UniProtKB/Swiss-Prot annotation:
InterPro entries: Restrct_endonuc-II-like, tRNA_endonuc-like_dom_sf, UPF0102_YraN-like. Pfam families: UPF0102. This is UPF0102 protein CPS_4433. Belongs to the UPF0102 family. One of its GO terms (molecular function) is nucleic acid binding.
């Protein structure tokens, strides 16, 4: 088990589940060699769950959790609208931090978590959109 959490999914609010799954994803990616930069970056356009570095590449991570794979599971829950919001938010982040979107290496990854919230199955999609 990557992360020990005794929280029951039944008594966990949506906000708490988001924090739990984002922590899990952050730890998972750190173990894969990525370096943590920031969590829950907000702009008027939306939110970026995690910002990590993979070498010199900025990795903007969307974390999704679903208890079951019904209705397509966690990956299918990322709509075209959500993707556009994330892309606009990335542009804002880069400009706010003095980075040029045209010559700053970056990508968008998805970490999809499914099943028991205390030991979810992890799917990591690099360059997801």
């Amino acid at each position: 088990m990557l992360w020990n959490n005794k929280t029951s999914a039944k008594n966990t609010s949506s906000t708490d589940k988001g924090q739990v799954t984002e922590s899990y994803a952050q730890q998972y990616l750190s173990k894969q060699g990525l370096r943590f930069i920031e969590r829950n970056f907000h702009s008027r356009q939306g939110e970026i769950d995690l910002i990590m570095l993979d070498g010199d590449t900025y990795v903007f991570v969307e974390v999704k959790y679903r208890k079951s794979k019904g209705f397509g599971g966690a990956i299918a829950a990322i709509s075209a609208s959500k993707q556009n919001k994330v892309k606009h938010c990335i542009t804002f982040y880069l400009h706010q931090n003095g980075l040029n979107e045209y010559n700053t290496p970056c990508r968008v990854d998805v970490v999809a978590l499914e099943g028991d919230i205390t030991q979810p199955q992890v799917t990591w999609l690099k360059n997801a959109f």
